[in-house]
């Protein structure tokens, strides 16, 4: 199977998000890459489900709380930007202060 670089990136993101989700379910606090991966994955899947940018900005802010991440991680992430494919094309979704 031959994948484009963008498709490889999406698969890597999915793998990291799956790992983060499993660790969160086990009660472990997430680190920076895991937090970014999980938030990004939720936004990408929401776009695939037909949600709009405004909905995804709100959903993205509710994926994780400060209790879900290692101390200091929430301060490191001021915003997350994800390029997602919607029914009407590709758009940039920006989530400000994603971990509250």
Swiss-Prot record:
It is found in: Cytoplasm. Coiled coil: none annotated. One of its GO terms (biological process) is urea catabolic process. Its main location: cytoplasm. Keywords: Cytoplasm, Hydrolase. Signal peptide: none annotated. One of its GO terms (molecular function) is nickel cation binding. GO terms for cellular component: cytoplasm. Pathway: Nitrogen metabolism; urea degradation; CO(2) and NH(3) from urea (urease route): step 1/1. It catalyses: urea + 2 H2O + H(+) = hydrogencarbonate + 2 NH4(+). Belongs to the urease gamma subunit family. This is Urease subunit gamma. It comes from Blochmanniella floridana. The gene is ureA.
